[in-house]
C-alpha cells in the first residue's frame, strides 16, 4: 500500500530544486511547492481510489476536504480506516513543531497550529463515523520511551467500549460517537 505525505512530497520538490530541504529554502517557495504537493497527493489518492487500490495519507484533518474521497471509497465498497494521533494542548503541538523544525522539518506559525488543533479534534467524529475501523491515540507524553496511549477505538463508526478519559475537548468529541455495546440494548 502506498502512503502519501504532502510534507514529504514538498521536501522532495525542494531537494529537486537544489535545496537541502525546508531548512535552507525560502518560505514563499515552500508554500508554493506545498500547494503543488497537496494537489499531487489529491490526484494520487483519486487515482488509487478509482483503481480500487489501497492508499494511505497523512493529514492534520483540520478541514473536511477528504470527506468526498472517503465517501467515494465507501460507495465503491471499500474500507476507510483512521488513525488519529493528538496531543492534549495546542501549546504542546507548537512545542512539537519547534522540535520538528530543529530536526530539519518545516515550520508552522503558532496561530495556524492553534487553529488546526481545534479544527482537527472537531473533525474527528465526522471521519470516525465513516471509518470501518478507527483508533485514537494521545501522544502528549514527551518521554520517547513511552508510546502514544490508545484512548479510543471503534468499528463501523461506533466506539468499542467507553474511551479512556484524556482531555476535555477530545473527551467531548468522542462522546458524540455511539458506544457498543449500547447501554440502551
Predicted regions and their residues:
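Conserved substrate/cofactor phosphate-moiety recognition/catalytic segment
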Residues: 1-53
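Anionic group-transfer/hydrolysis microenvironments
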Residues: 7-9, 60, 140
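Short glycine-enriched loops at secondary-structure junctions
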Residues: 9-10, 62, 86-88
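Switch/connector loops and helix/strand junctions flanking conserved nucleotide-binding motifs
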Residues: 12, 89-96, 143-147
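Short, hinge-like loop/turn segments at secondary-structure boundaries
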Residues: 20-23, 74-75, 98-102
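Glycine-rich phosphate-binding loop used to anchor ATP phosphates in small-molecule kinases
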Residues: 32-84, 120, 135
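A glycine- and Lys/Arg-enriched "phosphate-lid" helix/loop adjacent to the NTP-binding pocket
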Residues: 78-124
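NTP-dependent small-molecule kinase module
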Residues: 128-185
